[in-house]
């Protein structure tokens, strides 16, 4: 059976949850337990998650994925992302720029800005996606920038003009 269904942000709690499962299994094996279903269901307060766990992936490739955003505030009827990943949130531009420059210093030639809905970048920090793009364009090195998963309604004329004339 299934003991837990975890959201994206809860993956960091897996070691503690395994200990809890093992402890419960140990107790259950020594005594007969009758728990009702409500005692077994755990629901995280995903709408309350404020922290952001940024990552970047490069390995031995020249392409580097840099996560700049997670979650979504659009509760579309067909989508479970807000329930699994929580509200839209992101790190500050200064933090992302450090990760990006580090990747370039390690040999990356392509930076792929990624997230659930990166056009929503800045909601949690009071910044704007266009400012992130400008910061990426100022990084040192010979590279290009790719944008992924940006909703069309969040692409402004300013963003389109900037990308069309960007150095990278």
Which positions does each model-derived feature cover?
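Conserved SAM/AdoMet-binding glycine-rich loop
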Residues: 105-168
């Amino acid at each position: 059976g299934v003991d837990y269904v975890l959201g994206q942000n809860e993956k960091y709690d897996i070691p503690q949850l395994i200990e809890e499962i093992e402890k419960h299994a140990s107790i259950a094996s020594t005594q007969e337990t009758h728990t009702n279903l409500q005692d077994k269901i755990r629901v995280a307060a995903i709408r309350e998650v404020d922290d952001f766990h940024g990552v970047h992936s490069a390995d031995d490739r020249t392409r580097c994925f840099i996560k700049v955003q997670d979650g979504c505030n659009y509760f579309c009827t067909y989508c479970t992302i807000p329930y699994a990943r929580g509200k839209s949130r992101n790190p500050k531009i200064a933090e992302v720029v450090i990760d990006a420059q580090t990747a370039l210093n390690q040999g990356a030639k392509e930076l792929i800005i990624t997230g659930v809905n990166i056009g929503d970048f800045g909601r949690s920090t009071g910044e704007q996606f266009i400012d992130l793009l400008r910061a990426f364009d100022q990084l040192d090195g010979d590279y290009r920038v790719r944008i992924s998963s940006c909703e069309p309604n969040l692409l402004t004329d300013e963003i389109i003009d900037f990308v069309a004339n960007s150095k990278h």
